[in-house]
C-alpha cells in the first residue's frame, strides 16, 4: 500500500516517516526530508506528489503550530494550515482519486472551564488565530473521507525541540524560566502516536470523524515539567510559576485535557497514562 506523509520535515511527520518506512508492507512516500523538499503549499506541487504516489492513505502532519506566528502572519499561516487541506480534496475530486485522509488537529480547540477532560462534542473555544485555522481545516475534512485526530505530543528529536526538550534545556541552563500553573494537557509520546498510526494502517481502521488522541489522564505544564526534571535528576528551583495568559501575548487555551474514551472504544486501543509516557520517554531517549 502507498502512504503519503505530508509535513515530513516537521517534528511528528519526520518521526512518523522514519517509523513506518521500516515496515515492508508499507510504501511510505513523503514531501521531502533531505535536499529535495517539495513545497506542498503550492497546489501544482501538491497535485504532482499526490498523482505520482497514488496513495491509498494520506497523513497530513503539515502545518504551522507556532501560535504567535499565526497571529502575526494570518495570510501565510492560513495558506499552510487551511488551504493545503482544501487543495488535497480538490485534487481528489478532480482526478477521481480514492484515498483516505488522517488529519492531525489540535487540543487548542478546547478550554472547558470545569477543568475536566474535554469530549469531542464539547464546546469549541477560538482563543487565537491558530485554533481558528485548525477548526476551518477540520470543517473541510468533515465533508470528506477523513479521520481528524485532536492531539498533543512530546518526545526527543535531533531535528527539532519538543516541549520536553525545552524543559530539559531550561532546567540545566540554571537560569530563571516560566512554568505555567494553569495550563493542562494530555500529550502522548511521538513514538506512541507512531505505533497507533501503524496499528490503524494494518487494521485498515479508516473511520470518519473527530477523535481525541492523547494520554489517559493529564497534568498541568508545571506538574509535567517538575516530574520530568526529577526523573531526569536535573530538578532545581530556577523555574518561576506563572499563569499562561499573563506571560504570553497571544491568548492560549488553559484546559486542553482530552477525554479519550471515544478513541479507545472505536479503535480498540488502550491509551497510556501520562506518567507512564514520561517514564518511557526518559528511559528510551534521555
Enumerate the predicted regions with their spans:
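Glycine-rich Rossmann NAD(P)(H)-binding loop
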Residues: 179-184, 211-218, 266
Amino acid at each position: 500500500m502507498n502512504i503519503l506523509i505530508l509535513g515530513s520535515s516537521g517534528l511528528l511527520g519526520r518521526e512518523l516517516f522514519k517509523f513506518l518506512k521500516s515496515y515492508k508492507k508499507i510504501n511510505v512516500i513523503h514531501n521531502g526530508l533531505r535536499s529535495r523538499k517539495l513545497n506542498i503549499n503550492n497546489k501544482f506541487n501538491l497535485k504532482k506528489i499526490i498523482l505520482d504516489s497514488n496513495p491509498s492513505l494520506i497523513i497530513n502532519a503539515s502545518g504551522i503550530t507556532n501560535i504567535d506566528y499565526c497571529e502575526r502572519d494570518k495570510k501565510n499561516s492560513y495558506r499552510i494550515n487551511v488551504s493545503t487541506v482544501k487543495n488535497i480534496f480538490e485534487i481528489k475530486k478532480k482526478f477521481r482519486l480514492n484515498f483516505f485522509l488522517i488529519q492531525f488537529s489540535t487540543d487548542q480547540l478546547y478550554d472547558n472551564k470545569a477543568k475536566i477532560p474535554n469530549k469531542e462534542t464539547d464546546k469549541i473555544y477560538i482563543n487565537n488565530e491558530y485554533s481558528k485555522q485548525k477548526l476551518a481545516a477540520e470543517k473541510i475534512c468533515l465533508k470528506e473521507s477523513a479521520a481528524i485526530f485532536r492531539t498533543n505530543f512530546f518526545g526527543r528529536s535531533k531535528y527539532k525541540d519538543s516541549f520536553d526538550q525545552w524543559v530539559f534545556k531550561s532546567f540545566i541552563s540554571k537560569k530563571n524560566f516560566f512554568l505555567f500553573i494553569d495550563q493542562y494537557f494530555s500529550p502522548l509520546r511521538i513514538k506512541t502516536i507512531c505505533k497507533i498510526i501503524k496499528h490503524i494502517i494494518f487494521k485498515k481502521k479508516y473511520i470518519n470523524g473527530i477523535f481525541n488522541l492523547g494520554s489517559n489522564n493529564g497534568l498541568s505544564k508545571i506538574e509535567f515539567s517538575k516530574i520530568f526534571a526529577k526523573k531526569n535528576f536535573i530538578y532545581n528551583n530556577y523555574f518561576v510559576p506563572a499563569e499562561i495568559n499573563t506571560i504570553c501575548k497571544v491568548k492560549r487555551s488553559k484546559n486542553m485535557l482530552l477525554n479519550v474514551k471515544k478513541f479507545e472504544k472505536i479503535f480498540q486501543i488502550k491509551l497510556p497514562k501520562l506518567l507512564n509516557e514520561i517514564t518511557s520517554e526518559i528511559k528510551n531517549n534521555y
